Amino acid sequence: MAECNCGCGQKTNLIYACSGAANTGFLADQVARGLMKDGTGSMTCLAAVGAELSGFVASARGADSNIVIDGCAVGCGAGIFERLGLPYTQFVVTDYGVKKGKTEITGEVIEEVKNAIKGALCNG
Amino acid sequence: MKIQVLGTGCSRCNMLEANVRAAVAESGSNAVVEKVTDLDMMMDLGVMVTPALAVDGKVVSAGKVLTKEQVLSIIKE
């Protein structure tokens, strides 16, 4: 029998980013990609969940955890999960000292916010 | 009705497929059961967690091994 590589039986963490138009949306997106690169989970499409595409919604329902990274307090990502009754853990990048429309998003900022979220996940 | 079992062939995927085939046989339905192992097709359907089950192109479950009874209730819907 071929070795299983489908991920069955492993903990599945799905990561969603707001990816909005502001600097904070860009930061949320970059942090999500960084977390995926670090092996925290698999990034998938928040917009597809919002559009209620069946595969994305079923995956969110079947995942061990859904990590939603919102860009600001408007909380569109969390709003989508609330509306659909899906379980999630929310992080908002402006909670980490980033100002919407003001802070320049550098590699250093991305790394700092990513590590802070990673720490919260590990300690949560 | 077309029922797709999405998974790459591990034991949980195979269990779901067996439960689906048993449910279809018991229901007397003329549903066609298809095993999908192609990762690109799973991605196209937005499936990020396996095993998953799609009915007529709509994903109804992911990350769970549904029982025969659960599949039967889906078939009857």
What are these regions (language model features)?
Chain B
Residues 35-37:
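Short loop/edge segments at beta-strand edges and connector loops
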Residues 1-19:
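Local sequence-structure signature of Cys/Sec-based thiol-disulfide redox active-site neighborhoods
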Residues 9, 39-41:
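Short, solvent-exposed coil/turn elements at secondary-structure transition points
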Residues 30, 42-77:
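C-terminal structural segments of small proteins and small subunits
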Residues 5-7, 22-25, 56:
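A short, structure-level motif marking secondary-structure boundaries and short turns
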Residues 19-33:
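Conserved helix-turn-beta segment immediately C-terminal to the redox Cys motif
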